[in-house]
């Protein structure tokens, strides 16, 4: 049986290629280089990062199983998850730099236009009436938690409703921040940096972008993460034994799937 994890990973390479090609105006030679770099990127991620993800998920399951899910415990797990994301980004940016530093002035202008098109589409999405945005956010949040908890109880649903309300405007703030970072990236790319400098800049932009664009975003990120941390603590605190057993089972199942995928050869 093909697991959902394996199914998603099978199409990851094609999805990444399509997303990058949306923003880049590539000739035949550049297209070949891009495909090679994306293949190497996915292989690196499968070999070096997936086993770490599996270890992390098993660790979360172990913590919940022994009752280590107080505020400090959850905070440590969230920080460990952030460290994994940082490790992933630092590992992927060198591959991105290999084809990004080949962009000429007209290619960068093409990329800028595509970013604007994608941004305008997102602005339209966020311009829906507030009650619609709230409903959509609550549905996404509920679906994500139900994937692990199963059916949610009344107190958990109230927690999600409250969290959806207090974080409703965060998407607009994130879009504004992304816009600033994209503009800063385009300006830097126009200086025709070498591969090493581009990798260094990408790491800083993606991991510490507030140092380049808007310093206030760091405070927003910390507050937003704190809200999510509080939500996780309260959701698990109000969970039943059956729900926690389901969370543990789901986490270990994902970990096993990920370990299996990490050991597979890339499909040609």
Label each residue range with its predicted role.
Residues 17-18, 175-268:
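A cross-kingdom marker for long, charged
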Residues 20, 33-34, 38, 89-103, ...:
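Short, structured motif recognition centered on aromatic/hydrophobic residues
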Residues 39-44, 83-84, 117-121, 166-170, ...:
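A short structural micro-motif
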Residues 93-214:
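Extended amphipathic alpha-helical interaction segments
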